[in-house]
Every structure is written in C-alpha cells, then in structure tokens.
Amino acid sequence: MIEDLTIVIQGRYEEEQMKLWIENYSDWNVVVSTWIDCDLNLDFPKNWKIIKSEYPKRFADMQNIDLQISSTLNGLSEVNTKYSIKVRGDEFFSNLHLVYEKMLQIHPKVLVSSIFFRPLGLYLYHISDHFICSTTDNLKIMFQTTYDLLTKGDKFNNSPESHLGFSFICAKENWNLYDVYQYADVNDNMIKKWYDIFEVNQLQPYIISESSPEGRIYYRDNYGYGSHHIYEL
C-alpha cells in the first residue's frame, strides 16, 4: 500500500472489476462510493470504506457527469490522505504505484489517463476522466467547481471531460467560470501547465470500459490510439 494515497472507486461497480480491486488492493486505502441500489454481496476488506448514497437530483444532461461528480465528491469527503486517485467502478487498473510515482514528479499538475485525452485544440479543455490523480484537495476543487458550473451556468459542449478540465483551471487561475470562450486561445498552454498524461498501457492487465451504440465495449490489453486520442503532451 501507499500510506498517503487513497483510491476512490466511484459510481456503479461491476462484479469482475470489483473482485480485481479487492484481490490486488486489499491492503490499500480505498473508498468505494456507489449508489444505494448497487449491491453485489462482495466480501470487501475491513479497512475499506463503503459509501452507498441516494441518487442526487439530476443537474446535468451529459453522459451522467452529474452522477460522476456526486459519487466522487461523496467519496472524497471520506478521504484522510494527502493524495487521491479517482477511478471508475466499471474499470480496473494494475500497478497504480506507477501513477502515484509520476504524479509526485509532475505535481502540482494533475495526472490523468491517456484514455480519450483529445488532441489539443480539438475540443476545449478536454482531458480524460477515466482516472485522475493529484492531491485530495485538487480533486475536490475540480469536482466541486464543475458542480458549480453545471448547477449555476450552462454547459458549453457535450463533453464531461471538457467541463472537468476547464473548471479546475478556472479555480487555479481565478478565471470567470461561466465564459469558457474567453479563454479559448490559451487552451493549449493551460492544458500543458495544469495537466499531464499517463499512458494507460503501462497498467496492464486492466479493464477499460467504453459506451457505444451497440452496448458497452471492454478493452483488456493494448488499448489503441487514433486521430482523436493522444498519450503525451
């Protein structure tokens, strides 16, 4: 385990992935933040914290970003370590010590996965949200500021990752949260200033989940990259 790091597993979890988390990280600091109706009767380690919350009143029609924000903030509220890594309950990653080590090297930048990290300029402030690692305070800032944006203003596109990426920078740079286009011309510089990418294929074996018109797609090795994906800045 890493004493000053907590894994926050958020959202609905799937049995295969959660069993892998239990098998590989039973002695780590872990918070599982899920929903009241998610119950697979698994034997969770006694040192883990399990939070089952009521669903929030929906506040954003955008790929369940409101559920991600709520479950993540619920989980972060139970964290007592300096650093956290937010992951999804329908995914699994091995070797998270590598993420932690790189995060320390690039701090105060936030370290995110390479999954769906869009090329600079393709979409404003589009990071990846499949895992996010930084100080616990930084993660709280990111998700709380995104909550403020979506409950008090309007979404500026249909990408949850853009709102998370922009909101954190807004908080750090003291920008106007409700006018992303005012900062469009500094997108590339600010992404490089505040974020870095971890190439996910270093974390095999893994399970990565993606939605598609035909249903969920799962990747278990050699996650590829196309014209809409990058793995380094």
Residue locations for each model-derived region?
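Active-site acidic Asp-centered loop
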Residues: 35, 87-89
